[in-house]
Regions:
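Conserved phosphate- and dinucleotide-binding cores of soluble alpha/beta proteins
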Residues: 3-7, 58-218
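N-terminal active-site beta-alpha-beta segment that forms phosphate/nucleotide-binding
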Residues: 1-77
Length: 218
């Protein structure tokens, strides 16, 4: 059975390491803030000018003045800081972000990503994604394995406008965890109840499969 959005976020949260500074992109990635392991300290950054994001607020306790880059209300942790976007992007471009988690429309087996524009649909711009893919030390994509029409998002070539090339290291989808290696996609884990055959069928590129593939632990 495929994961829902929260399941994807839970699995991404297992990639966080103590001391990391992490930027969470719009969409599924923002949910990761709810699942940061309690035994580590991670500082979450939002490019609109907030360092030290906490979980989403409980119902009825939201502060409308506290929002992330996706305009969602958030909470802050002790020691959090607010600043303008120029300083926020100085942090990003200066290489001070250890990990970025982004959503995507397409990802290739070489690590290319398209995440900001679908021709014919109105968009407000790419936000901070291009700066993030060019500067972050590690990039994970959190996404569904296929689009709403059932077509693979994991491909050999991006057909949509690119955000960055050869930058994505890992994909966590509703079906699988896949590393991007020098030889292409490599299957690491599968979602509970999902077969290797289903993953291969729904991936638009060859996938390396070595030995028994374990189920994800959430």
């Amino acid at each position: 059975m495929s994961l829902d959005k929260n399941g994807i976020a839970k699995r991404v949260a297992r990639e966080l390491k103590d001391g990391y500074y992490v930027n969470l992109g719009i969409g599924i990635p923002t949910l990761v803030a709810n699942y940061v392991p309690e035994n580590i300290e991670v500082i979450l950054q939002s490019e609109n000018g907030l360092l030290g994001i906490g979980p989403f607020p409980e119902k009825g306790k939201a502060d409308p003045d506290l929002i992330n880059a996706g305009k969602q209300t958030v909470t802050t942790i002790p020691g959090s800081a607010f600043f303008d976007s120029s300083l926020s992007f100085a942090m990003i471009r200066g290489g001070h972000v250890d990990l970025t988690v982004l959503g995507a429309f397409e990802v290739t087996d070489k690590g290319d990503i398209s995440s900001w524009k679908i021709p014919g649909k109105m968009v407000k711009g790419m936000g901070g994604a291009m700066d993030l893919v060019a500067s972050a030390k590690n990039i994970i994509v959190a996404t569904t394995h296929t689009d709403r029409h059932g077509k693979p998002k994991l491909k050999t070539r991006c057909d949509l406008p690119l955000t960055g090339i050869r930058c994505v290291k890992k994909i966590v989808s509703d079906l699988a965890v896949i590393d991007i290696t020098d030889k292409g996609f490599k299957l690491i884990e599968r979602a509970p109840g999902v077969s290797v055959e289903e993953i291969l069928e729904k991936t638009g590129a060859p996938v390396i499969v070595e030995g028994d593939i374990p189920e994800m632990k959430l």
